[in-house]
Amino acid sequence: MSKILKIKARQVFDSRGNPTIEAEVYSKKLSASAICPSGASTGTYEAFEKRDDNNKKYLGKSVLGTVNLVNTKISKKLIGTNIHDQTRIDTILINLDGTRQKTNLGANAILAVSMAAKKLSAKIKNVPLYKTFLVKNNYKLPYPLMNIINGGAHANNGLRIQEFMIRPDKAKNFSEAMRICFVVINNLKKLIIKKGLSTSVGDEGGFAPMISNNEKALDLVVAAINKSGFKNGKDVSICLDVAANELMKKDKYSIHSKKFVSVDQSIKEYKKIINKYKIKSIEDPFGENDWMAWSKLMKNTNNVQIVGDDLYVTNLERLKKGFLNNSSNSILIKLNQIGTVSETLEVIKFAQIIGYKTIISHRSGDSEDTFIADLAVGTNSNQIKTGSLARSERVAKYNQLLRIEEELGKKASMSKIH
């Protein structure tokens, strides 16, 4: 039996230049490390991200206190534990914290250790990480939901909707999916330049031109798809992350303009852009507690992927409530929303049993860590959301998926999205 002999944490930086935590777990001869990501638009019910809140240290954003918790409290509790018993490791971490949202130790401390332990277990077994999750054979590659225009909390350009994405629906393999996205992105860049707009990028690598109107952004995306020789809604589909929590006041929303309107009016406007632009996926169309609005949208849309992110926060209890209310048909999976690998796998497993599509996701403050690429393949998740073909912390995940596809060889195939 391989046991945990040592755990060491350190403060490093995420892709937004903010401090985050890296944990390294050691066995007798090997070690593995993992870096915890961080979100910008976060749900109220997410597991707690613990920071020092000392303005003299990184303007209150340092995690040195959290690092110390790993190096003392967590390390002491886990030393001697079987590295291959992920459930036990995570249960010890959960019980040691003792709170619903992991406020004592911080989900960032817990997750970094949980991920590092999972990596080390695979390393000791000398198997690829993706082979250590839920699937034991017949691995599927996810379709990329590639962010090509950033708005909302991810860019300072006035766009209401946070993410405009493309999905290469007709790609026969992951390599082809990447090629299709590459072509559309490069044609989009040319169109943006032609309009005299900036091609600077947002937090997740998508372009962030100064466009204040959602439909103008959508027109640009459609033009880029057409210019690339593809059919919108058939070869390539447009997908949105609205992040409606950021656009809500009481029971009204300002999604499509600065004017706040009712849920019913918002649904009418959604239906309009769905039909006009052949939108195939909408994430967080309404607020995290507006269950009725979500259910109404589900009743008023057909063949559209309605994705719960802030609604579910990778939490099994909230997912079960959403299922009973018919609130969505898909769930976004973010490891740091719940805080351990085991709990994340539990949510994915349940979501797939009830017929939901599972979409593995990065965070806007991410790193070179590629754990989620392996997680997507190892759970046969339908899609992965990990930014654009810009910024190395985003591209790192795509490169890992290409490596996995190459390793699988003729056994590699794409997941189902319809």
From Swiss-Prot:
Binds a second Mg(2+) ion via substrate during catalysis. It catalyses: (2R)-2-phosphoglycerate = phosphoenolpyruvate + H2O. InterPro entries: Enolase, Enolase-like_C_sf, Enolase-like_N, Enolase_C, Enolase_CS, Enolase_N. Its cofactor is Mg(2+). Keywords: Cytoplasm, Glycolysis, Lyase, Magnesium, Metal-binding, Secreted. Catalyzes the reversible conversion of 2-phosphoglycerate (2-PG) into phosphoenolpyruvate (PEP). It is essential for the degradation of carbohydrates via glycolysis. This is Enolase. The gene is eno.
